[in-house]
Each structure stands twice: as C-alpha cells, then as structure tokens.
Amino acid sequence: MERWSINESAKIYNLPNWGADLFSINKKGNVCVHPSPTSKHSIDLRALVDDLIKRKIKPPILLRFMDVLQGRIASINRVFKNAIDENDYPATYQTFYPIKVNQQRQVVEAIAKFGKRYNIGLEVGSKPELVIGISFATGNGIPIICNGYKDTEYIETVLYATKIGYDITIVVEKMFELEKIIALSKKTGIKPKLGIRVKLSSKGTGKWATSGGEDAKFGLRMSEIIAAIGLLEQNDLLDRVKLLHFHIGSQITKIDKIKSALIEGTRIYAEMRKLGVGIRYVDIGGGLGVDYDGSKSSYFSSVNYSIEEYANDVIYQIKNICEDAGVECPNIISESGRATAAHYSVLVTNLLNTNTSNAMPDFEETLNGTEKLAPTVKKLVDIYKSIDRYSLREDYHDTVQLIQEAVSLFNLGYLTLNERAMAEWLHGKILRKINGIVEKIKPIPEELQNFQLSLRQTYFANFSLFQSIPDSWAIDQLFPIVPIQRLNQKPDVMASIADITCDSDGEITSFVGENGRTKYLPLHKMRKDEDYFVGFFLIGAYQEILGDMHNLFGDTNAVHVTFNKKTGYKIDTVIHGDATWESLKYVQYKGPEILKHVRDTLEKDVALRKVTIEESSHFLELLDRTLLGYTYLGE
C-alpha cells in the first residue's frame, strides 16, 4: 500500500482552510469535531456514527453539535467586543439571530439559551416566526425585531405585545406599511417601537447581490424617508423611531462592498439624527459570510475577509462617519445567522454502491491475441501496450478518436456488442494508465488537465440532495464533503456523489478541493461488508428549512450532541426522521386508508384464488412495515 498521511488527506479536502479549527483528522484516519477552535477535546465522527447505528438510529443522520453553535455565538460577540475596545467605541454591540436561517425549535431554543449572556435577540420575518419569537421572549425578556411584509393581524399582534411589555421593534419596509401601522396605533392607542429600513444604492456580491441596490425588494428610498419622517411627526410617533436598518444581501464575498454599505448607511443615520429622529440602534443586517471552500477569495462560496476584519471595519467605519458628522455613535446590531449556524451541523450518510460493477467482463485475453480483433479494437490494444510519458498527448487524442469511432461503427452494424464492450474496457484501461503517469508529471500538460473526468465514478449516497442540501442543487453552492474514515489511506477513486432520488439533477459534480473548486471527490474503493460514510459539512444555515420532499424522502434522523470530558460525548436529543406514513400525510394520503383498500382488494383475490392467504398476509405485512419505516434505504 502506498504511504499516505492524514496531513495529505487534510490537504486534498482543504479541511484546514474551511474547517475554522473545528474539524480535524485523528491518527485512526477519522474526522473529528471540536467544541471550539482552541479545544483539545474532540468527538470521533466515525465512532459516533457507529454508536448511533447500534442504538438503531440509521443513516442518513443529521448531527447537530450544540457546543459548536455556542462557540460561534461566543466568537462573533468576542470579536465585536475586541473591536469596540480597540477603537474606543462609545456604544454597544448586539447579535440578533434571524429565525429563518433555521427555525427548528431545538436550534432556536439553544441559541436563546446560549445567547442569554450576550443579550442575543431574535429577528422574525413572518407571522409564524413572530409566534416563535414571542414564545421564546415570554419570561426571558429576549428582544425581537420584526421584518418582512406585515398585514393587520401581524401589526396588531406586535402592538399588543408592546403593550404587554415585550421588547419588540417593528421595522417599516414600505410606505403603505407605515400608513397601516399609524392607523392601527391610533385605533388601539398603543405606540409601537419603530425601525425604518433604508434602500441603499450599495449592493452586495454573489448570489444575493439583488438584496441591495435601487431595485431591492425591501426598504425606503431617500425621498420616502423624508416623507416618512413628516408623516410620523404629524402623528406624534417620530420619537418612537429607535432603529435604522439596512441589508445588502447574504454571504457578501467582498469586504469592500461591506465598507461601502456601512459608509452609506451610517451617513443616512447621521442625517436622520440631524433631522431630529432619535435613532439609538443601527441594524447592519446580515451578510457576514462563510468560507465554504476555504479559498479566502471573493468567489461566491468563499469570503475574502475574516470575522475579525469584518468586526473591525463595522466599528471603525460607523465611528469614523459619526465623528465626522458630529452625531452620537449608535448601538450596533447585526443579523449574522449564516455565520452563527453553518458550522454546527453535519450530515453523515453511507455510500451504497457505484456505477461500476465487479461483474464486468474481463477482456485481458485481448491484450495477447489480436489477430481476430476488429481494427479499431486492435489499435486500442496497441496504444495500451506502448503508451509512456513521451507519447501521452498523442495517445490520449488517438484513444478519444478511436472510442468515438467504435461507437459509430457499432451503430452502423460493423462492430458486435462484444467488440464495443472490448473497446470500452480498453478505453478505461488506457485512461487509468495515463492517469498513473500524469500524477507523476509536473506540470500536467494542458490538454490532459481535464481528462480525469473520464475516470470519474458515480458513488450513490443514501440521502436526498433536495431534502438535505438543496442549495447545492438550486444555486450551485459548494459544501465541503469528506469521507469520515480511512483518511490515513490514499484515496484511489475520483468520484461524483449521486443521491437516491429518481432525478438526474440529484448529483453533485463540483467539490471543495486543494486548489479551490474541483470536478471530482477523492474517495476510497468500497470494501465488501464494510460501511463507508461521507460527511456533508457547514450545512447548518438554511438547508434544513429549505429542503423539499422530492420523491417523498422526508426529514432525516437528527441527533443533538454535546461534548463530555468523561465519556467523550453526550446525546441530548434524538429526533426521528419521517416514516413513510408521515411523508405520505404531507401529500394528503392516509396510511390506514391505503392498507384498508389493499386489504379489501386482496380478500377478493383470495376468494377468487388469485393469491393464497399466506401471500396476501405477507404482502400486507411488508406494506405495513414500509409505512412505519424510514423513508431512506436500509440494508
């Protein structure tokens, strides 16, 4: 076996650069998770998954590491505290978690609990999210910011929550919304705590750039701000405006775009203060990105700045503009949901098989006796025997031409099925031989840099891409994917990952690699009777809630894990994934009705002796077991 180290594995998956010091590889070759970047403690992912399977918790399994979530909250607050101290900033910083990032009860509950020491708030954008926010704020004093479109019911709920004593701010997104708020305030006699969202000309970058700029969906234009101030003053509500909000998009990849937005947004704040609006908070929205591919670049799956640089720029730019304008520095709020939640969640699942088969015919004899072979096949044999590093380019080009020729000859009836199969087999042998030579050549000839795609095998994984990582399909988002074991061995397969849905789009063909995006994932050959697991990392933001029910594959099993010094880990919560009957219920089918319909039909067939009682009973038992079982694949 070729010598290989865990450091080499870490390098080819670029783990040190995207892992934020939260993931490593141990001496066994297994991926480990750390509770914080500075912690020496870790959990062996493969050992954890093996233990969960013994507990009858089957893959795919969504692992939520709650200490990592707590650590991310602490990190964001720590870097802002440091930036405030270094810049002698005279006001405060506060984090608000946007519930839309992941609305799962246990997740919001953990964030509310961990964030209490930092006075963390919740941002809501709909009536259901408002109810969630109120439920967590009850008895806890958690502040709430209300964004999004609002109807009468939404606004009235906020007004009465204000009256009862909740710390809740309703953000004006549109002028018609302000008019409705004023009317309902008069009707109820309740004065709300108000925020105003402004539409900046500054825009973000990447997939969410349209969240900012003149054509942004939300926010008031400059002329509308002037009109809003006048309207609020007329209705004795100007003193209720406490917050200014702007947002130029999620996953902002370039720090200069953030600086531009901060400068413009703070200038608007300063001018509004001069007009007599007593704003105390500036909410800079989200946008703090995650380096999914570890490239530290402005590519949309990365960011060209650190969290420390982000915090320093926020504090410096706001202070600088306020001092220049001669106005009081505001308290700062950010809604960094992606940066808070992305790292804490890992999906682990088993690989089922590949698109290659051990039952493939072996044409080794063709390498010896070539007299009876078709000329095209004979030429392929000759190339295979003679190829070396000096003839690589020519032999590669000839091989491509000959395999195309073989297909054409077969279609015209001049090659038999057996001869075409021989040509395919030889094509694969030649490419693998070329690859063995190319791996030792530096630099790789330009014409050969993409030929490895011809060797890429498809590994089928027990999951639904559309359910578990929908952004991979919808917007071509990169997520790190790494085998969680055997990383002390050199990977010997170049693979793509296909899910188990009946959809050709359910395949991942772009991966995080050593030098950025790559078209294949290095994996190991699967061994008979041995499970092989891969982990999908940095999926804690948006993926769970955006997932859909394609082919009726439902929610996966989810396990909440915390670190324990004595036992290594502690399982806090197990949330079982959807059974088949639950998935069917989403689309208005009822398991008992299905069983009754089938049973009634089978009873008629038994009476007519089309089936036996035993066959009928066995089929109903299988159907019942399927309804009660996991939607994903078992043995």
Swiss-Prot record:
Belongs to the Orn/Lys/Arg decarboxylase class-II family. SpeA subfamily. Pathway: Amine and polyamine biosynthesis; agmatine biosynthesis; agmatine from L-arginine: step 1/1. InterPro entries: Ala_racemase/Decarboxylase_C, Arg_decarb_HB, Arg_decarbox_C, Arg_decrbxlase, De-COase2_CS, De-COase2_N, De-COase2_pyr-phos_BS, Orn/DAP/Arg_de-COase. The keyword Transport does not apply. Keywords: Decarboxylase, Lyase, Magnesium, Metal-binding, Polyamine biosynthesis, Pyridoxal phosphate, Spermidine biosynthesis. This is Biosynthetic arginine decarboxylase. One of its GO terms (molecular function) is metal ion binding. Its EC number is 4.1.1.19. Substrate binds at residues 282-292. Catalyzes the biosynthesis of agmatine from arginine. It catalyses: L-arginine + H(+) = agmatine + CO2. PANTHER family: ARGININE DECARBOXYLASE, BIOSYNTHETIC ARGININE DECARBOXYLASE. One of its GO terms (biological process) is arginine catabolic process. The gene is speA. It comes from Geobacter sulfurreducens (strain ATCC 51573 / DSM 12127 / PCA). It comes from the Bacteria. Its cofactor is Mg(2+); pyridoxal 5'-phosphate. The modification N6-(pyridoxal phosphate)lysine is found at residue 100.
